[in-house]
Swiss-Prot record:
Cofactor notes: Binds 1 [4Fe-4S] cluster. The cluster is coordinated with 3 cysteines and an exchangeable S-adenosyl-L-methionine.
Active site: 93 (proton acceptor), 348 (s-methylcysteine intermediate)
Binding sites annotated in the UniProt record for [4Fe-4S] cluster: 113, 117, 120
Taxonomic classification: Bacteria, Pseudomonadati, Pseudomonadota, Betaproteobacteria, Burkholderiales
Protein name from the UniProt record: Dual-specificity RNA methyltransferase RlmN
EC code: 2.1.1.192
Pfam families, sorted: Radical_SAM, RlmN_N
Length: 387
């Protein structure tokens, strides 16, 4: 049986090479890429400006398949969360956050996470596997065209774009799944695909120093760093990766990255934990840390979203405001992240949700297989959004 090539796995250069293997010229790859990423098409017969001979070849050798949607929930504040099947009993979550002038999609890069930050529920489920390119970019593909379909907006460049910003802040550490992550980033930025600005795509890392340097050369998008502590002793306990890449190395990597970044600052994410990292002294240590390293930055303070296994609690709002004020008085731009989607477990640090209960996921997948056997393989799947 011939293995079908998932065209969502291919970046622009790879798609040109693939078309070359089929005896086609490079311009066919560009046409194909537009159909896939600008029109959301998965049916080759719908790609009417492709030669029929090419469509026939593709129908027997290729497929366009994003992860199937297991569940779809919308929060009272408009935040929308999809649980998607990435196979072998694994599922990841994708979250859309609508705002007045933009729509941000938070995507996952791994099923589970090996970093195991103390305050993050995703890490508590352990690491299962890396996602493929198609599973990463497929989250954007699925979400963009599902949002358009929901609102009755036509596919293609003329239709109003629903996702204007992408943040790699979902499940997993992006820089520990480097090649698929970078390939997906390149597709996001390509004008023949999604055409997003580098300033509107943010990768968040817990601090994999060598890969930060590599990213600066391969695909320098906006950088966010999960900092969460003002000194090594504290960060060792909250972010175990710090034992391998301590703060002095991380700060130096951030400074090097800014030579190539689309923004002139790094965003430091800081989860506010009551009695752990939220004192004025911690804030003063942060000021000294970034000044000594000479890293232009802004801080995004994140109210902790509690979960039972953490043993941690959220800092009180007055404490968060006081902490922010210390930073701002030192001239550091500081924001406090709004808590969005917490009623559907879509808020920051909560992306384990239904995935954490592996038995329930297996039950849902078994039930889905039964329905597909009865009603056809496409039951419950978003397979064609171009019509």
């Amino acid at each position: 049986m011939t293995t079908l090539t998932n065209l969502l796995d291919l970046d622009p250069a790879q798609l040109i090479a693939y078309c070359g293997e089929l005896g086609e010229k490079p311009f066919r790859a560009k046409q194909l890429q537009r159909w896939i990423h600008q029109f959301g098409a998965s049916d080759f017969d719908a790609m009417t400006d492709l030669a029929k001979s090419l469509r026939d070849k593709l129908a027997t050798r290729a497929i366009i398949a994003a992860p199937a949607v297991i569940s779809d929930h919308t929060s009272a504040d408009g935040t929308r969360k999809w649980l998607v099947d990435v196979g072998q009993g694994n599922a990841v979550e994708t979250v859309f956050i609508p705002e007045e002038n933009r729509g941000t999609l938070c995507i996952s890069t791994q099923a589970g996470c090996a970093v195991n930050c103390r305050f993050c529920s995703t890490g508590k489920q352990g690491f299962n596997r890396n996602l493929s390119v198609g599973e990463v970019i497929g989250q954007l593909w699925m979400a963009e065209f599902e949002l358009r379909r929901t609102k009755g907006i036509e596919p293609g460049p003329k239709g109003e774009r629903q996702i204007t910003n992408v943040v790699m802040m979902g499940m997993g550490e992006p820089l520990l799944n480097y090649e698929p992550t970078v390939t997906a980033l390149k597709l996001m930025l390509d004008d023949n695909a999604y055409g997003l600005s580098r300033r509107r795509v943010t990768l968040s890392t817990s601090g994999v120093v060598p890969m930060i340097d590599k990213l600066s050369q391969d695909c320098a998008v906006a950088l966010a760093v999960s900092l969460h502590a003002s000194n090594d002793a504290l960060r060792d306990g909250l972010v175990p990766l710090n034992k391998k890449y301590p703060l002095v190395e991380l700060m130096a990597a951030c400074k090097r990255y800014l030579e190539f970044a689309p923004r002139d600052f790094v965003t430091f994410e800081y989860c506010m934990l009551d009695g752990v990292n939220d004192s004025d002294q911690h804030a003063r240590e942060l000021i000294a840390l970034v000044r000594q390293a000479d890293v232009p930055c802004k801080f995004n303070l994140i109210p902790f979203n509690p979960f039972p296994e953490s043993g941690l609690t959220r800092s009180h709002n007055p404490r968060i405001k006081a902490f922010a004020q210390v930073l701002m008085d030192a001239g550091i731009v500081t924001t406090v992240r709004k808590t969005r989607g917490d009623d559907i477990d879509a808020a920051c640090g909560q992306l384990a949700g239904e995935v954490q209960d592996r038995t329930r996921v297996q039950d849902r997948m078994k039930k889905m297989a039964e329905y597909q056997e009865k009603f056809g393989k496409n039951f419950g799947r978003i397979v064609e959004i171009s019509s």
